[in-house]
């Protein structure tokens, strides 16, 4: 798996942004005539993440001995086949590369729908969000954090990363004027800050 190789090369600094796009162009890139409906994309994402994590776990942490003197490269007793047969995927495994340095790369999910928040609550270390108001952001935070307990996770195991578009001015008035100008050319609401 190329991604796992990148994680090794970077010393465990790679992250995986799990995207369940609704783009019809993306569907065509994967041999699909039409894109699956929203809910089905998230069901598929849950299974896909399970498969990928299972493949990452196919080698135990200490499976690779790499002893040149004895020519003992790896311990075959510490390799496991995945043998996953699910609704969308059938994968035997194992991978042909060691576990990532930190176990798994950081998993990021960016979805504000109920399905997206559920996927993040079950699988992600980070969720990206772009709420329009402070009140919406606080409600999102509380909602997504409350989903972790049913998966045996604590609120500390999921970081919420808000999308912020700062507009800076010498005064608050300058920032608001810049914000107004920018809003005319953007479909995103922007919060003003003065320095």
Where do the model's predicted regions map?
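Single conserved hydrophobic/aromatic residue that forms the stacking wall/gate
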Residues: 1-2, 180, 184-195
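Amphipathic alpha-helical segments in well-structured domains
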Residues: 3, 42-45, 49, 137, ...
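Short alpha-helical segments and helix-capping/turn motifs at coil-helix boundaries
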Residues: 3-4, 92-94, 144-148
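Gly/lys/ser-thr-rich phosphate-binding loops in alpha/beta enzymes
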Residues: 5-9, 134
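Internal, glycine-rich beta/alpha segment that forms the wall or movable "lid"
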Residues: 8-123, 151, 155-156, 165, ...
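Flexible loop residues that form catalytic
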Residues: 112, 132, 187
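Glycine-rich nucleotide phosphate-binding loop and flanking beta-alpha elements
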Residues: 115, 134-135, 190
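Glycine-rich, aromatic-lined ligand/substrate-binding cores of catalytic
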Residues: 119-146, 150-153, 158-179
């Amino acid at each position: 798996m190329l991604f796992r190789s990148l994680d090794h090369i970077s010393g465990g600094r790679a992250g995986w942004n799990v995207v369940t796009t609704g783009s019809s162009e993306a569907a065509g890139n994967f041999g699909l005539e039409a894109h699956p409906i929203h809910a089905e994309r998230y069901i598929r994402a849950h299974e896909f993440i399970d498969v990928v994590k299972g493949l990452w776990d196919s080698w135990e942490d200490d499976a690779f001995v790499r002893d040149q003197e004895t020519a003992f490269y790896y311990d075959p007793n510490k390799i496991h086949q995945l043998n996953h047969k699910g609704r969308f995927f059938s994968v035997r495994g194992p991978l042909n590369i060691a576990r990532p340095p930190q176990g798994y790369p950081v998993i990021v999910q960016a979805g504000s729908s109920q399905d997206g928040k559920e996927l993040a609550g079950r699988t992600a270390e980070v969720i990206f969000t772009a709420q329009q108001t402070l009140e919406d952001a606080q409600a999102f935070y509380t909602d997504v954090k409350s989903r972790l307990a049913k998966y045996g996770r604590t609120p500390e195991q999921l970081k919420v990363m808000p999308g912020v578009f700062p507009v800076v001015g010498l005064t608050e008035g300058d920032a608001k004027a810049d914000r107004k100008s920018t809003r005319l050319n953007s479909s995103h609401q922007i919060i003003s800050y003065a320095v």
